[in-house]
């Protein structure tokens, strides 16, 4: 516990002040301190990848669907390996759940074949029933539905990981959308001082995958 506190103090002093000293911390209305997102070009040679966790945020008629592959290392780091992203915006014919199921399964197989480590978990927003059922029907992949809690509670779990200096992402074209959405992720100023602050629900699909990871 003391080691975790010291790690947070070293990696994200603002979050340490907020969490342990009870001080007001100014990030404006930005949710995350982007200096805690560490880009890497290759996987670390001294910290073995032991498994992969997939997290899925399902979209609807006008909303994007995102799947992120998070690698877990022996030393407890979390590395974003790859991102699959589909947006129906501006498309006359939207993809059906049966088509999304095929695309996502191909993404999963490509990642597993590349890294050759076990899949530790599949997590999905509990509201996304159609795609979850479709993937079980097509491939017997059982996604674990995660009920959404208060937004601030879900964000805190990922924020703690960031503050401990344990989050990394491969600096690839596919992962740019993850970084950009987290840069733009903001609290709604109308709710920021309330008992239940909420975020602005725009272009936040990869953010939601990170929020349901744990």
State the predicted function of each range.
Residues 20, 67, 122, 182, ...:
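A residue-level signal for conserved active-site and pocket-lining positions in enzyme catalytic cores
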Residues 196-214:
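Acidic, Mg2+-coordinating catalytic module of metal-dependent nucleases/exonucleases
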Residues 1-59:
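ATPase catalytic-site recognition across NTP-hydrolyzing enzymes
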Residues 64-70:
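Short beta-strand scaffold segments in enzyme catalytic cores
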Residues 57-59, 127, 210:
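Anionic group-transfer/hydrolysis microenvironments
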Residues 60-64, 76:
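Coil-to-beta-strand transition motifs
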Residues 77-199:
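Mg2+-dependent endonuclease catalytic cores in nucleic-acid-processing enzymes, primarily RNase H-like
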């Amino acid at each position: 516990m003391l080691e975790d506190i010291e790690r947070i103090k070293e990696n994200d002093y603002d979050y340490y002040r907020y969490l342990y000293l009870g001080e007001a911390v100014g990030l404006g209305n930005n949710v995350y301190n982007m200096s805690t997102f560490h880009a890497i070009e290759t996987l670390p040679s001294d910290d073995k990848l032991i498994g992969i966790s997939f997290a899925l945020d399902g979209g609807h008629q006008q909303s994007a669907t995102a799947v992120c592959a998070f690698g877990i290392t022996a030393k407890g780091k979390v590395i974003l390996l790859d991102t699959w992203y589909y947006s129906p915006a501006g498309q006359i014919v939207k993809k059906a759940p049966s088509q999304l199921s095929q695309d996502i399964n191909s993404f999963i197989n490509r990642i597993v074949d590349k890294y050759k480590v076990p899949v530790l978990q599949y997590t999905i927003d509990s509201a996304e029933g159609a795609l979850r059922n479709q993937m079980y029907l097509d491939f017997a992949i059982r996604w674990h539905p995660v009920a959404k809690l208060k937004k601030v509670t879900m964000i805190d779990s990922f924020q703690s990981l960031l503050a401990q200096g344990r989050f990394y992402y491969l600096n690839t074209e596919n992962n740019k959308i993850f970084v950009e959405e987290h840069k733009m992720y903001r609290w709604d100023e109308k709710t920021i001082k309330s008992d239940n602050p909420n975020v602005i629900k725009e272009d936040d699909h990869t953010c939601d995958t990170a929020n349901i990871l744990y």
